[in-house]
Each structure stands twice: as C-alpha cells, then as structure tokens.
C-alpha cells in the first residue's frame, strides 16, 4: 500500500520546488483562473511557517495590507505556483513565527541574513 502511495506522490511532486526558509520575505507568483482567462497574481510577504511533509507540504505567507494582517496558505507542490522569489532572506531562530501576529510596527521586523561571498 505504501509503495502505491509513494508512486502517486512522486508523480504529483513539483520538478524543482522553490528553496526558501521561514523568515524570508518572498514574492509568490500564483496563477488564478477566472473563467477562460488565466493570470498571475503576486503575493509578497513573510514566510511564517511550513507545515506537513511530502506532497501535502504547505507554507504560510503573512503581509500587512492597509494596516490589517493578512495570511495566505500555499501548497508547496501546487502546479498553480508559477515561481517563488526570495526578496530578502531573514535571520530567525524559530521554526514557526506565530508571535509576529501580535507584534506591531518595528517589533514585527525580521533581521536580514547576511551571507559571506567566497572570493
């Protein structure tokens, strides 16, 4: 039974899933179908968590829209995700950033991860 499930999941998985981490500010390019037309909507925000594993893995992106916090959950292996761009890598020490929901203003900011370039 598990071999059958693994075969089906292998077919459904994305070829190259995007590489990003919790704390990163990302732009998610998401395909939206309205009638016969298809367009791409960009959703930019902070990745606050990853959930589950395998084909059902999801990530939650939070942004402030007109002073109101908005969160959206995206399936990682969805064919509707065109691409995920990392705008700014973040430096965090937690796997789930749910505490950001209660923070306001400057307290809700995440430090930027600085990486060394190999010369």
UniProtKB/Swiss-Prot annotation:
Family annotation (PROSITE patterns): RIBOSOMAL_L19 (PS01015)
Coiled coil spans: none
Key words of the record: Ribonucleoprotein, Ribosomal protein
Domain of life of the organism encoding this protein: Bacteria
Gene Ontology molecular function: structural constituent of ribosome
Pfam families, per database record: Ribosomal_L19 (PF01245)
InterPro entries: Ribosomal_bL19 (IPR001857), Ribosomal_bL19_CS (IPR018257), Ribosomal_bL19_sf (IPR038657), Translation_prot_SH3-like_sf (IPR008991)
TM stretches of this protein: none
GO terms under biological process: translation
Gene Ontology cellular component list: cytosolic large ribosomal subunit
Summary of the function given for this chain in its UniProt record: This protein is located at the 30S-50S ribosomal subunit interface and may play a role in the structure and function of the aminoacyl-tRNA binding site.
UniProt similarity note: Belongs to the bacterial ribosomal protein bL19 family.
Annotated protein name in UniProt: Large ribosomal subunit protein bL19
Organism field: Treponema denticola (strain ATCC 35405 / DSM 14222 / CIP 103919 / JCM 8153 / KCTC 15104)
């Amino acid at each position: 039974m598990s071999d059958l499930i693994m075969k089906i999941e292998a077919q459904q998985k994305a070829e190259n899933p995007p590489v990003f981490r919790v704390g990163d500010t990302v732009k998610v390019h998401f395909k939206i179908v309205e009638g016969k037309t298809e367009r791409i909507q960009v959703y930019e925000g902070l990745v606050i968590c990853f959930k589950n594993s395998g084909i059902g893995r999801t990530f939650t992106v939070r942004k402030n829209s007109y002073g109101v916090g908005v969160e959206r959950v995206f399936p990682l292996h969805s064919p509707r995700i065109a691409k995920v761009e990392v705008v700014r890598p973040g430096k965090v020490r937690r796997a789930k950033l749910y505490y950001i929901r209660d923070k306001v203003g400057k307290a809700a900011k995440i430090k930027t991860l600085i990486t060394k370039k190999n010369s």
